[in-house]
């Protein structure tokens, strides 16, 4: 069965000697069933709407059903309310066996917009139809025929003929769909979720800058998965080792921004150990080698490096890394158990991140611009996606 679901607006059933949207869609598609949704303001039209529907052709007698709930005039201009109301209505009547038509051109702008969005987001098999005005322009200044005699309006209706001019437009809303995908991609970029962004961009039709945005984000995604250095960082005037350290630190920042606290805990200690190893090797040649030999260790932990720093009276550096050492018990809990993190552990992470940034900045003299790499990348990507 073909079913038309339609709100009733001021231009229904007729306006300026022509069909309103509701009647025109029924004239074109001849639905066997018409479900009408009235507001308090339009409820008085029920008899005229039914009469107009039956005037389309002598042999056309659709089943007309009025939705039980009448929409308050106080709500018809509130988009959120209309979105929820019409979502519920569509779900109430929808069946997979029937072919549904949705009128996108009757009622208030908020109702029309709600129906338009519902059609795009619900993912159900509904044919959404718009109707252009007879003039194919705005009909804002054309009066309504609400107070005229319905029989006379039917008699003078210029669309009431076999070879009427079809003004229906089946809506596939491709531009809207693309705009929605683009907005979703922007939202993911702002959350530093580049993998999700790339998945969305791969669904977009081509537009200026899309290729370059995809390439930049794909590079970031690949580098994050392999712990490699993004091309944008490679272009900075930094030594290879500095690029790796900065990239490792920024990856930890990204994980924290995205709420991946557990991953941040694990990575902070690893990067700190690398920095301390680099610091000691550059200043105390052979110290680490001899310590490994004495202790018969291949891998040195943050505690080993701390002991070595104490032997060299590096008390300022020891004070700097103290919050990271204190954090280690929480880090071990994350790495070796499935227990959730408590509030104190999350607080420790914030302190440890500040400590790590201080350590990285002091040892390698990175600028604030270096630390803002992903924020600056996001600004560039968002500008290209405008």
Regions found by a protein language model. Give the residues of each.
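Long, low-complexity, Lys/Arg-enriched
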Residues: 1-99, 110-386
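Conformationally flexible catalytic loops at phosphate/diphosphate-handling active centers
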Residues: 102
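Terminal helix-to-tail segments of small alpha-helical proteins
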Residues: 106-108
